[in-house]
Amino acid sequence: MKQELSLLENQLSYYRSQADYYSRLSRSNGTANFGISGRSQINIVAVRTVSGSMGELVYEGIIMTVHLELREGEGRLLINTEPKIGIDLQTSANTAILVAEELTNQSLKTTDVILTVIADSETEILDGPSAGAALTVALLAAINDETADPSILMTGTINPDGSIGKVGGLIEKALASARFDAKEFLVPYEQSVAVVYKTEETHPAPGLTIITTKPELIDIEDYIRDEGYELDIIEVNNIVEVYDSVILEE
């Protein structure tokens, strides 16, 4: 758990510095003279820690809803949460704005982007950057006046070139998606498999018990099926693939 938390912290630091740089660069070069109006909604999947049956901390997937609004303004990014949610969306949202501007050839420097994140309870989220792909889809949908399919969920960071970056907590996110009755779960390329740690107990002698933990590579879709759910796990490389998969046809 410490290793994965360290990885998530490093991701946060990296994407914060990266997005801040590109955000300043992009907004200084915009050309639009008036703002854009639009709305969209998308569900995001994240991971939080909860207390296990023995009092230990364990990971748990959580589904939250993001309402996105574009309105004429000053190029601000405004993030609200209901109720209080500890999540860093600022970095991934800034990168999402850059990618959306590039793909649509629209400047958002005179448009305010307002995100409202709704969860079922107060919580601390570990991996805000993994919502980057979903936020980019929401932005594109609002600009294009299109609708994202609520039965398709996703996880993945968004890079300035539009590629989808790898994330952690795939098992927990996939299980939460399945329980949400999603039909598809989009994951970064080569992340349809994950490592789980299985505990084995042996008794080599009377009164002696040896417990070992071994890593095992599993197919996430098979794991979800073994848990009693059906969920298609689909690998994606870039935001264009994601958008084409998610947007509902008129």
Locate predicted features.
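Peripheral, non-AAA+ core regions of ATP-driven protein-machinery
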Residues: M1-E250
